[in-house]
Amino acid sequence: FWGALFKTVAKVVAPFVPDIVKWVQEKV
């Protein structure tokens, strides 16, 4: 169950990862 949930979340979050990384780098 958790594996499937994680895969679904990863699919949804994947497009936003670059923006998140950029935001984190700006904060550091």
UniProtKB/Swiss-Prot annotation:
Q: Which UniProt keywords apply?
A: Antibiotic, Antimicrobial, Secreted
Tissue specificity, per the record, is: Expressed by the venom gland.
Signal sequence: where?
none
Report if keyword Secreted is assigned. yes
Q: What does this protein do?
A: Antimicrobial peptide active against Gram-negative bacterium E.coli MH1 (MIC=3.5 uM) and P.aeruginosa PAO1 (MIC=10 uM) and against Gram-positive bacterium A.globiformis VKM Ac-1112 (MIC=1.25 uM).
- Protein family per UniProt: Belongs to the ponericin-Q family.
This one is known as M-ectatotoxin-Eb2c
Organism in which the protein naturally occurs: Ectatomma brunneum
